């Protein structure tokens, strides 16, 4: 089976099948999750110096920071699956 890759922005790709959540970075629990991932060495920053707008959480415990909106990333996942209904 081919691995589905998701464009997380600026030429960076993430294994779409490994993602369990795409969330906004604004809440305290998500900020704490990002901080804990940084301490564990499981934080991947693909923002290229831009403001973090989405946090992707993988099933491996890795936390990925992206400069794209969560809606944009979710839309890319749906488009890659061929599901354009959004539901």
From Swiss-Prot:
Domain of life of the native organism: Bacteria
The family database entries (InterPro entries) matched by this protein are listed as:
RemA-like
Family the entry assigns: Belongs to the RemA family.
Q: Which HAMAP family does this one have? A: RemA
Record-given protein name: Putative regulatory protein Synpcc7942_1027
Q: What is the species of this protein?
A: Synechococcus elongatus (strain ATCC 33912 / PCC 7942 / FACHB-805)
Q: What is the lineage of its organism?
A: Bacteria, Bacillati, Cyanobacteriota, Cyanophyceae, Synechococcales
